[in-house]
């Protein structure tokens, strides 16, 4: 009995490139079957390219692994630009066999995808540390130094202690081998994982501040200077989580 096109499409979802059944379907003259095969082949190419890109984002870590450094921590921060809320940093040590292909710079991902990947990273990572510096401290030491403090705090939370650090556009005062990478969150899976942990952690915190301080839209803008946020400042004033040294807040105090 000839299999239905609908059933073949269903089977293709779980078919590997080496499956002998593919040879049988390739002989099927029905247009629907051939179109389904073309779609499957296109998806396989995309998956292969995705895996290749993912593996290339372990190139820097792999260089360290080959030198005997097993515990490599990726470090990244989020929240330098907002007018309100803390700067949050994360440090993540991934295992050599980490296989979550979608991990990349958090800015390239939807909020839903970041939440999904956050859970997978939490599950699979060897260790995760999160550092946080509040707005009042940012005002005292400046945002650049605050980001460094948050990153250092995140690294110091890691257990086991990392043997080397891969850091996105920053150097830390830590006695560990470290590599400074421009756009590191798109070049290293470890930094990409850290960027996701930091971003989701901060977004969830800002959502809670949206409930505590209504009228600014923190749950939507994460403290950035959107129209709603700026109008809230004009109507209500500033909150304890606003950064008083950031324009336009400093201009109205």
Curated annotation (Swiss-Prot):
Residues 70-253 form the RNase H type-2 domain. It comes from the Bacteria. It is found in: Cytoplasm. The keyword Metal-binding applies. Manganese or magnesium. Binds 1 divalent metal ion per monomer in the absence of substrate. May bind a second metal ion after substrate binding. One of its GO terms (molecular function) is RNA binding. Keywords: Cytoplasm, Endonuclease, Hydrolase, Manganese, Metal-binding, Nuclease. A divalent metal cation binds at residues 76-77, 168. Endonuclease that specifically degrades the RNA of RNA-DNA hybrids. Belongs to the RNase HII family. This is Ribonuclease HII. The gene is rnhB.
